[in-house]
Amino acid sequence: MAVISMKQLLEAGVHFGHQTRRWNPKMAKYIFTERNGIHVIDLQQTVKYADQAYDFMRDAAANDAVVLFVGTKKQAADAVAEEAVRSGQYFINHRWLGGTLTNWGTIQKRIARLKEIKRMEEDGTFEVLPKKEVALLNKQRARLEKFLGGIEDMPRIPDVMYVVDPHKEQIAVKEAKKLGIPVVAMVDTNTDPDDIDVIIPANDDAIRAVKLITAKLADAIIEGRQGEDAVAVEAEFAASETQADSIEEIVEVVEGDNK
């Protein structure tokens, strides 16, 4: 039973790729057709690869893997944070700071500073400091929380990285590859899939598409951690829904539409 139905993918707009002139030829085998200058992703393949990604993430979580969710563009930021928190994992949803993984020691020092400022506020230190100094500390804390708040409690370098739009997050992907961290990613038609270990061919520019895929991978983590199928009821319901009978229906849906 597929973890995501064709109907769900269609409704979320997962099939819309980029303009044909912006494509990466290495994504050709994941593209079904082209309509009005837009590539249409083969959702039959998306269903298959989403299943593989789900299994990979579930098995990793069952082995107590630390998973880092990465998505810094506005279409991904909320879903990445919400689903990482829901699944008990960690996230970066603003600008990726170079060296976040490859210079982990320095990042840990900045996180320690963030925690120190928080303690200063909690233990009353702020009350005896000059207002200007408190204002500077609050500004520093806000900046640190913005960029590092999602990994503040991450116990170690992640065992798995999930990325929305690896084309945009190239630095993050390169750091993961350098450290041998497997990367699971939503891969759109403008992206080179070669650096991704577990791909999900999908529209990574639509909020609903990002939310759907990201939530399913969070479900996989929850299932892996619980040691049971925590989303069996939801999956059964999805399977009972009316689904697209064939890939040709996708063409009918997207005829005349643009990304």
UniProtKB/Swiss-Prot annotation:
MF-aspect GO terms: structural constituent of ribosome
Ranges in a coiled coil: none
Gene3D superfamilies given in the database record: Glucose-6-phosphate isomerase like protein, domain 1, Helix hairpin bin
Pfam families found in the cross-reference section: Ribosomal_S2
GO cellular component, one term: cytosolic small ribosomal subunit
Gene Ontology terms describing biological process: translation
Keyword Lyase: no
Keywords: Ribonucleoprotein, Ribosomal protein
InterPro entries in UniProt: Ribosomal_uS2, Ribosomal_uS2_bac/mit/plastid, Ribosomal_uS2_CS, Ribosomal_uS2_flav_dom_sf
HAMAP family according to UniProt: Ribosomal_uS2_B (MF_00291_B)
Record-stated family: Belongs to the universal ribosomal protein uS2 family.
Name of the protein in its database record: Small ribosomal subunit protein uS2
Protein's organism: Streptococcus pneumoniae serotype 2 (strain D39 / NCTC 7466)
This protein's encoding gene: rpsB
